[in-house]
Amino acid sequence: EGADIDLGNNTFGGHEALVVFDNVFIPNERVFMCQEYKFAGMMVERFAGYHRQSYGGCKVGVGDVLIGAAALAADYNGVPKASHIKDKLIEMIHLNETLYACGIACSAEGKPTKSGNYLIDLLLANVCKQNVTRLPYEIARLAEDIAGGIMVTMPAEQDLRDDMLGPVVRKYL
């Protein structure tokens, strides 16, 4: 509350929704499955596979931005050529490109189905998901190391606007 810059992107940021269908008419031509329970598990598995495959692209875009920000922070801190900083940036790039490779692999190893759809490789999609549950956090940890503590302990906008704290924050940041 009382902040404009700490809100994130309220137009295009993430969102969740609860959708309730109560007494809704759905025309037959729009019904996807009707009492075909034996296919429900396969449908969920395939949906999850495509969702996991897409992580290989979307999380990597965020990683690219974070890697660029970490490199800029190293530059601002006057240490862009330090070997330990370069090693961390290289590791971040390696981890991020590993995620991308997982997304590409499960797509490239997919096969067409009899119905004309294209099914990604579900095993490799799960490998992609497993890497997505770990590697972005390691990339963020390395970015924190490079940027220094200010990246993770930066004062809030409310502190910046505070009559007593604001001048101190502005002096050092």
Describe the role of every protein-language-model region:
Residues G2-N96:
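Glycine-rich beta->alpha junctions and the first turn(s) of the following alpha-helix
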Residues L123-L173:
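Alpha-helix capping/hinge segments and adjacent helical runs
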Residues V44-A48, E97-T98, P112-G116, P155-R170:
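Short amphipathic alpha-helical patches
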Residues V62-E138:
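Long, well-ordered mid-to-C-terminal structural blocks that present hydrophobic/aromatic surfaces
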